[in-house]
Amino acid sequence: MIKSISWNPIFQVMGIFFIQPVVLGVWLALIPKVQSGLNLDTSQLALGLMGTPAGMLMTLHFAGKMANTFGIRKILYIGFPVYFFSITLIGQAGGLYSLLLVLFLVGVCGSLLTLALNVHAGRVEIHTRRVMMNRCHGFWSLGIMAGSFLGSVLESESTVWLILIICASASFPLALLLCLGLPSYENVNSAEMSPALVITQLPAILIGICFFTFGISMTEGAMANWASVYVKEMLGPEAQGTGYGFGLFAAFVAFGRFFGDSLKIKLGTIKVARIFVNISILGLIFLVIANDLWLALAGFALIGLGVSVGFPLAVTAAASIDDKREAPYVAFLSLIALIGFLVGPPIIGFLAKTTNIKTGLTMLFPGLLLSLYLSSKLRSSKPKKKK
């Protein structure tokens, strides 16, 4: 049995949020290198990249029930090593279909970790009576940003497989250490208290929250999958360091999330959501009209800032609807978010094949406008105090 380590629960969960996406960020920076190595065009790459969200979508169908049945701690202890190992297999992909299969496995493992982390963060927020969900996701963004910059630096130094092996090997011990002594906020009767989730009986507020998240996640998915390709298309096929565009996007996502909690307290959830969605729309306009790298980088920064608080606000709102159904509700929210993540990149890729990447990015405008319209559905949830 693993012995406990005494951690501050807030710092602990933020640390786990940071370490979880580091290797993922390395992979995202290496997408152009993998595309060149496998000789894939934009539509083929779009198809291959569908593996991750497809795996997440399939797993999230039963992830909420697994969280209640096995508990958050077991999912984290088992999920981290399998997740890191699955990402390293990307370096062994020999073609489109093997890449699709490996990324599907990454998605399966990633969905369980994502759900476990968000549910645990929500419970820490409730038990400590501290507003911290945005900061947790801020640390997640810092982690993926650090991985992206690391991947850009190492891109020309070795093979994709070796780079991923090194980064995963360094991240795993830190993840395991942070998970030791994780406080148990499990509800011992959660399996009995959480009735089956029936789509037709979902509360209207949850539906509104989910589709607010749809446009945000579609934009995040597009940036994760196409930011490096966008920069490479702008600078030329021999350009190095193309992951810096996504790194800048992730940096501003982190920046926005660190200030998101205080802004939420001062301005309220709905006003913050509207302001930030408008910022992301402005950033997308910059990307579509950019003729030089500096305007494009400004666009990446604004989009990162604009989408930064969307998902954390939605997670807090969804988790606070019903204590007995927090895991299924967060799982359903993640499902809708990942549908957005799934829909955006392939549409952009297929359109970019016949036109260019800028034209493909215009497909993000309807989703962001939907998020702007539905921002009124978010309620200003605050952590519930113990009686």
Which role fits each region the language model picked out?
Residues K74-T88, K271-F286:
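Structural signature of the two symmetry-related core transmembrane helices
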